[in-house]
């Protein structure tokens, strides 16, 4: 039950692209980003990289330009959530194999829905009694009672939709007609049909036909939403420009306004401290940030500029850097010894002379397993992945400023700092890490500004 509700909520976010869309502007919307972040974090993490890779492969910039008339001069810079709209839309419109649909579909329709097929069919019958997927469907009184008492998905979705509309206005207006007014019903039908198609006892021919209809539905929503962004940019370009990029992303989006909001590990309080320490005049002077404010940066670029300002202008001490930086390491690294073993093993390959990379027989025993583990650096992974998806592979896009090897080394050393018992070694490694990151951030920030000019 909880899985189905969570799945529908995630579907609502991904398809309607409500958060940070520019089809309606409401300053209160920024609180939603944290709601969706938590929803997505609870989703199965092992599908995340696979889905991102398929989105990246499906994203054809030339196709986007041809179909949606993206400005050729490159002055239109989209926020990360808006890029997702175009990636989905281009994947659906340009790719004949609909890889993007397959990736999303697997997120919405899961084996966990198998045991609820009877109730899903019953729900579908309420809205589409003549649907071919439920021909000859019958339900016993006992089954009906269970569905009525324990399966009120629509009502719960309706309540969630009302909360959204209180903040955003009617969903169909907010998304320029891409989603109907009764979003709760639409997404319940989508998930119900998807589960019946995937797990129901129906003919292969009917299964294929109905899945194509679901693809068309998903494609239609994606393309309409992307076209809405293009039209809005052409008619109201100021809606996509930010006078103060730093404040826009960090004060309005990431820093909580509700004092009672959950703050795991004091993350937001540290973020506020970082924000307060940033010297904007220093950013303009050292990095020649455009003073007229008419240049908008995508969120990953803003992140890099902020980090660069922090390291260059404020002269933070090593301990503060360590506390801020290490907090972002992969959470599993704190809980599983196997990650330490894999980290040591991989770091030994990249940097055999590192004192942190003295591998043991236990580490060697994990060799095969380690090859399948991707250890990512969280504070870099979001800006780097988003930036790379937009402009090409990282080492090409940044002229070699940051390479995969550098990211891996920084990742591994950061994670290993949890495990190091030798205080002197820990201090030395932290200093080395701090110097490496500072240098790379400065170079990358300058390169971004040069690209904007």
Curated annotation (Swiss-Prot):
Name used for this protein in its record: Balbiani ring A 67 kDa protein
Short name of any one Pfam family annotated for the protein: DUF5442
Cysteines engaged in disulfide bonds, as pairs: none
Cellular component, GO annotation: extracellular region
Record keywords, A-Z: Secreted, Signal
Function: Used by the larvae to construct a supramolecular structure, the larval tube.
Superkingdom of the organism of origin: Eukaryota
Tissue: The 67 kDa protein is not tissue-specific. Thus, the puff Balbiani ring, which is tissue-specific, contains at least one non-tissue-specific gene.
Signal sequence region: 1-23
Compartments where found: Secreted
InterPro entries named among the record's database cross-references: DUF5442
Other remarks in the entry: This ORF may only constitute one exon for the 67 kDa protein.
Main location: secreted
């Amino acid at each position: 039950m909880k899985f189905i509700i969570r799945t529908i909520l995630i579907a609502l976010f991904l398809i309607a692209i409500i958060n940070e869309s520019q089809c309606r502007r409401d300053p209160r919307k920024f609180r939603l980003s944290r709601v969706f972040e938590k929803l997505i974090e609870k989703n199965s993490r092992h599908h995340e990289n696979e889905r991102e890779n398929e989105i990246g492969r499906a994203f054809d910039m030339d196709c986007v330009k041809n179909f949606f008339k993206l400005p050729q001069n490159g002055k239109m810079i989209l926020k990360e959530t808006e890029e997702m709209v175009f990636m989905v839309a281009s994947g659906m419109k340009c790719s004949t194999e609909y890889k993007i649909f397959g990736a999303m579909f697997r997120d919405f329709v899961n084996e966990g829905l198998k045991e609820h097929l009877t109730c899903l069919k019953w729900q579908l019958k309420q809205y589409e009694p003549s649907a071919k997927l439920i021909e000859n469907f019958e339900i016993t009184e006992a089954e009906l009672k269970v569905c009525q008492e324990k399966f009120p998905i629509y009502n719960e979705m309706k309540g969630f939709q009302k909360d959204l509309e209180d903040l955003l206005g009617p969903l169909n207006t907010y998304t320029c007609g891409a989603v109907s007014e009764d979003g709760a019903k639409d997404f319940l039908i989508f998930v119900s049909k998807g589960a019946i198609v995937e797990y129901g006892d129906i003919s292969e021919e009917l299964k294929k036909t109905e899945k194509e209809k679901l693809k068309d539905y998903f494609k239609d929503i994606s393309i309409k939403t992307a076209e809405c962004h293009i039209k809005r940019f052409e008619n109201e370009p100021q809606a996509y420009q930010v006078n103060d990029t730093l404040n826009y992303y960090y004060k309005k989006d990431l820093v909580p306004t509700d004092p009672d909001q959950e703050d795991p590990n004091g993350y937001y309080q540290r973020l506020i401290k970082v924000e307060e320490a940033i010297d904007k005049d220093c950013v303009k002077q050292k990095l020649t940030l455009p003073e007229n404010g008419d240049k908008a940066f995508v969120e990953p670029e803003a992140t890099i500029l902020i980090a660069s300002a922090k390291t260059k202008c404020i002269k933070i001490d090593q301990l503060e850097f360590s506390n801020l930086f290490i907090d972002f390491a992969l959470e599993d690294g704190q809980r599983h010894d196997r990650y330490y073993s894999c980290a040591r093993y991989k770091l030994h390959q990249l940097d055999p002379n590192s004192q942190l990379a003295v591998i043991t027989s236990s580490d060697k025993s994990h060799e095969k397993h380690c090859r399948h583990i991707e250890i990512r650096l969280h504070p870099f992974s979001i800006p780097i992945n988003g930036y790379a998806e937009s402009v090409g592979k990282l080492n090409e896009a940044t002229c070699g400023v940051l390479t995969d090897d550098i990211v891996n080394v920084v990742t591994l050393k950061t994670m290993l700092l949890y495990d190091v018992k030798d205080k002197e070694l820990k201090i030395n490694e932290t200093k080395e890490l701090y110097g490496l990151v500072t240098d790379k951030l400065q170079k990358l920030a300058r390169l971004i500004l040069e690209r904007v000019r």
